[in-house]
Amino acid sequence: TPTDSYLLAFESSQNVTFFGQTYVPDSVRSSVAVKGQGNSIVANSNSSGAAFPVYLSARIFPSRSSYKFDIKQEGRHWIRLYFYPIPGNNLTSATFTVVTENFVLLNNFSFKSYNGSYLYKEYTVNVTSDILMLTFIPSNNSVAFVNAIEVVSLPDILISDQAQGVSPTGPFNGLSGRALETIYRLNMGGPLITPQNDTLGRTWENDVKYLHVNSSAVNVSVSTTSIMYKTAVTPEVAPHFVYSTAESMGDANVPDDNFNITWVFKVAPTFMYLIRLHFCDIVSTSMNTLVFNIFINTDLASGS
């Protein structure tokens, strides 16, 4: 159980269950304080488009407003933000910024391009004090809003301070001082994993739509009961459901050295990316027979 766990449904009149997690009205959490002025709105429960209960209510901020979360455990925390521009409140034209004390999470973000659809954002930040401030700043002639917020502590083992650089190559230090935004989290060869099946409340989507050539890969799966964790690895790193499925080469006997499985992701070119790969050999029939290379674009990330 996380030491810090805030799951808030803003302006909800009751607890809300969403993918197995319970969100409480923000008004009942005494350890969460708000600074600034905010109007509240509540969507009609029959509102078209708001298919999930966590999106049925929201708080609107006409001016700069902050939420203060009391933190018991310093270190990495999830910050998850849920947005849905509830019809009839002119929120589809909202443009605003969301910041912590040290990081900009959203910068002059506009909902005009989302055409009234949902928006979910997930970040991890290293909290180094007993308070986390989350501030919403409307742009000129606009408002800010939010439907739900999660602030949840996570184990330090999940993200180390060092990673292996690819371009340029070499060790990269200082991850603990950086904020990270989740862009993609995939369950290779397996179904969607929702938060109730992940001890850290993560969502893992199926990888098929990112495959460059669908026929290049085949799904492999085993029972989750057969998955064994080493001492340094726990289900918090990734749940059994992740390690019990995989994508394997469509034909491992192809003589062409260029045969591969490739996934393609759209990314913003101006950012640095942390890529985490999870492996559990559920394919080999004998020891030390699984040999392959990993490339990121044209750079060799890991060689056999």
Please give the residue ranges for each predicted region.
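Compositionally biased, intrinsically disordered or flexible polar/acidic segments
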Residues: 1-304
